[in-house]
């Protein structure tokens, strides 16, 4: 049957815009989306009807660490090799696959390593999103319907959104988060219609602002703002003062 549903999991600002590259947003934001994607996948798999099983495949950018997705079988968590914009505030070095904050242009402060991500060679690699969908539609993975999750920035998601007849709806100003966009015969599946569900975290424009030509001080302020955004979406944060073990649970991340 091939791909019958696609869920695009990405970041989104208040105007419905998504980052062009993974490096335009702090890696902690991608970490939250990765964990949410895995939790949603597991929840749907448990609630699925045993008579009509559905396969789940999670495709992500090679610049995003797998996180809990590493618990899935290797064949169901492929990657597409993407390359960060050289002007993005965060970038990955090709040799070590180390994600680093880009240093200021004047060289007053060196780049700051943020985390190490497993090299893409540890995962099944697709040449592109479209080729991967064609592979799934070929029946190589059986006849069960497939739910494809796409996790990444515009350089990965646009290949699907632009292939649909109403692609402008996803990036239009004021586009609602979690909107269900029905696509009529986009050429990605033999089905008459394909549901593309766009899920994102509402964010401020500062999250995706380019800081390569700004001062390091502004970059630091945006980084702190991103961490504050993360801590309100489900991370365990340390409480200052008071009794107890000093840890409290922040509100859970909700994406509708």
UniProtKB/Swiss-Prot annotation:
Coiled-coil ranges from the UniProt annotation: none
Ranges of compositional bias, category Basic and acidic residues: 245-256
Disulphide bridges, residue numbers: none
Domain of life: Viruses
Ranges annotated as biased composition (Low complexity): 167-180
Region of interest called Disordered, as start-end residue ranges on this chain: 100-120, 167-186, 236-256
InterPro entries assigned: Herpes_US2_varicellovirus
Assigned protein family: Belongs to the herpesviridae US2 family.
The protein's name in its UniProt record: Protein US2 homolog
Naturally occurring in which organism (per UniProt): Suid herpesvirus 1 (strain NIA-3)
Lineage: Viruses, Duplodnaviria, Heunggongvirae, Peploviricota, Herviviricetes
